[in-house]
């Protein structure tokens, strides 16, 4: 999910349990194929019956008919919009790996170390779940990048992305527990211009995407709670290209620097150096691109989008190290404003607090809503539209009561100063024992 704000904005840490192959999205040829074969044609045999016997009047021989071969299903490819479940596209449910990056320096030995390679093979189920989620994300976002246009409502864009994710994972999330098996890892964020993160339309929202907007598209897909968190930025005016390029470069720098035993502070310093080497000209004025210093990347635990570790995007962060087996969302945010965000606008994102202390609830609406959240989302983030989709109504009083009781955490939109523009790029990486895998990498970014 978008960013994990640092101490002054993050009310509490959520602690939980915890590729396109080689950067290319798979082609239709990689999908499970079954060549279509035409039915056997017996016309050639029509005149082949033997003539009647001579003087002996032998009986006419019967024509031998060839048995018809059954047609095999044609090669399956993804539809537009994406609606074909991934399980139907990949033989044996083996999904493309992400970008594989060998460790460097003191960790170089891990690439060939037999023990580390053995440990890596032990993680196959874990990796296949992540790779499936990543392939869902790639196929959905690549269609979205082609079709998002000015004039669309944010609701139309968000629901289109979310419907595709649910279809490709094979989990519509309308039955109790189904969304916990797969589907949306968190709501589709569509944060525009000075708003950097955590904005998705609530019911009745009429906001329309404009030609001059800069929109961050941040959504997650999960399989069995293995959340793939990846984001990109859409802008139609090339004047914003340097801003987008700065943030993309910073994110790739963070990915390059990340690794086992690497300190978070070192990653943040490298990200800031890359980001702030850019500037963008708007209306004749040069603006330095600034890191949004109180937004961070984060580790991801099963069913928990924000784990206990943060990845800063500026220098001076803590000395915590990344560890073997961890999963991180490396995300960076750049701004033409102050480079600092505050809570603003109407809240749409929420999540159950893992291991929250029991609190007696007096409102029956709060009790009923908590039951719905537990059965349908667990600790996965959700938004008001998701409650509407489940048929819930008149739930705001109960929802606010759960927030004030510390059972549910709200995530208001995070915004820089009005008139500024912000951009975001993000990938999920897995620190495997022998290599680093950029699980969500595609040929788009």
From Swiss-Prot:
Keywords: Aminopeptidase, Cytoplasm, Hydrolase, Metal-binding, Protease. It is found in: Cytoplasm. GO terms for biological process: proteolysis. Disulfide bonds: none annotated. It comes from the Eukaryota. A divalent metal cation 1 binds at residues 218, 229, 426. Residues 59-74 have a biased composition (Basic residues). A divalent metal cation 2 binds at residues 229, 298, 331, 426. GO terms for molecular function: initiator methionyl aminopeptidase activity; metal ion binding; metalloaminopeptidase activity. Its EC number is 3.4.11.18. It holds the Pfam family Peptidase_M24. The keyword Chloroplast does not apply. Substrate binds at residues 198, 306. One of its GO terms (cellular component) is cytoplasm. Cotranslationally removes the N-terminal methionine from nascent proteins. The N-terminal methionine is often cleaved when the second residue in the primary sequence is small and uncharged (Met-Ala-, Cys, Gly, Pro, Ser, Thr, or Val). This is Methionine aminopeptidase 2-1. It comes from Aspergillus flavus (strain ATCC 200026 / FGSC A1120 / IAM 13836 / NRRL 3357 / JCM 12722 / SRRC 167). The lineage of its organism: Eukaryota, Fungi, Dikarya, Ascomycota, Pezizomycotina.
